[in-house]
Amino acid sequence: MRGATHAKWVACAVTVALAASACGDDGDSGGSGDGAGIVRSSWGDPQSPVEPANTNEVQGGKVLDMIFRGLVRYDPETGEAQNMIAEDFETTDSQKFTVTLKDGWTFSNGEKVTAESFVDAWNYGAHIDNNQKNAPFFSNIKGYEDVHPASGEAKAETMSGLVVKDDLSFTVELTDKFSLWPDTLGYQAFSPLPQAFFDDHDAWLSKPVGNGPYTIESYTKGSEMKLRAWDGYEGPDKAQNGGVDLKVYTDNNTAYTDLIAGNLDLVDDVPAQQLRNVESDLGDRYINQPALIIQTLVFPMYDEKWSADGMEKVRRGLSMAINRDVITKEIFQETRTPAVDWTSPALGEKGGYKDICGDACKFDPDEAKKLIEEGGGLPGGKVTISSNVDTGSHRVWMDAVCNSINNALGGGTCTVNPIGTFADFRNQIGAEKFTGPFRAGWQADYPLIQNFLQPLYYTGASSNDGKFSSKEFDDLVDKANQETDPGTAIESFQQAEEILAEQMPAIPLWYQNGSAGYSENLSDVSLNQFSVPVYDQIKVN
């Protein structure tokens, strides 16, 4: 998915524009010793209003993860797919599945969670008229092409592969065999929706109603979102606190300063500038652990200047002009690891992690120059790197990457294009505004190698922002998805990855650890494998 997120009077003076979120008494953690206080956490405004099939970035995903529960949920420690609302998945051929639900689940408005709640939600998410970003996640369900054709109008209102049997069961027919399909259903696009969503969509978007451990109390764009524990939640992961106030910051250094000042309880992205001091500042309240996150630079393959024949040499050459070892050591203080493929070491070798990029991900200025010259040179003789700079210390590494490229290829070759906010950055990506490589931080939707490859590089995929297209790559992904043996499937996915190494539609930069820091007000703070705080388990002291 789609990214990454003192005296009191001093902090207030610094953050006067954020006074409502950083300095007011409203939202005080107010712990009473029973863990039921409010957690004050840093956050960034999502690109769009949060809804399951239309949110594919990290900030909105954090909210969905608190207010929804789906068929499957990933264990916060291991990433293992575990049934949540699903009682069972039955199949004899890995293509036709019968899904049985547990009884007793409800939405926070009192509506029951039924088979229809899932089928209606998935049909809505898939239909072309609804313009949902995550529609391609439903593309392997039979009938998808009728509700979401490659061109023209829909031929049907619903997918033929989805059939409600009764309140607690429905059947799913896929277009091809996909043995791991149930394991993908922990992604938030597959969440159920109440009838209220369809009765008054605008009202629902203004205050989403879900079936998770939290409800949304209020949201002020640019300031904060208040979520409160739902007393009626009967799931196994009931909130251990009274709620979470997600406070908007456009600079994570400011968030860190507020944490140290006692005006904030949790930051889930420690800025690079603070890494040298974070252990002395926070001690054992600093978390640094591997996560299912990779940072890349995506080429705008929609621009023929970058996608023309021979330009793969230029793209590979730029990759070899980046000194990942120095950047990760000097800037990120061991919270990043130089990338050697397009997945994550958190998958492990059994999960498909392997050095596939090879020499193309190693710093070699001479070879970089040679390849770029052989490929016809950089378009216009220069390259501009774009990224949002409101979170994640992005401006610091952008400058470092450009300095590396300039040192390797000659001064003035590389410049940076900092974008003020994540929302604006994503909007410009969607409008295909960039004429040079742009940052893509991918946080896996589920812990499978497939999720690092298909959503990002498959033709027409939901997060294929650079519009890369390769029939050979697509065919290998299709082949992998149809394998019933996981080991054989992984081999096919790795063969598809080799196409990425040849074509370099995106430069792998580094794997990102999950990092967080928290105040003395909190306990039981942890990050899941996706580097997102396990908010429902946090206690306020």
Predicted segments with their positions:
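Surface-exposed binding/hinge segments that line
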Residues: 90, 100, 117, 126-194
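N-terminal lobe/hinge region of extracytoplasmic solute-binding protein
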Residues: 42-93, 207-209
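Extracytoplasmic/peripheral linker and loop segments enriched in polar/acidic and small residues
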Residues: 90, 163, 328, 411-427, ...
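Long beta-strand-rich cores associated with HINT superfamily self-processing modules
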Residues: 516-541
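Gly/Pro-rich hinge or "lid" segments in bacterial periplasmic/extracellular proteins
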Residues: 173-239, 243
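Ligand-site clamp/hinge motif
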Residues: 199-202, 231-277, 292
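Structural transition elements
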Residues: 337-374, 390-396
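Ligand/substrate-recognition segments at binding pockets and active sites
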Residues: 347, 371-444, 486
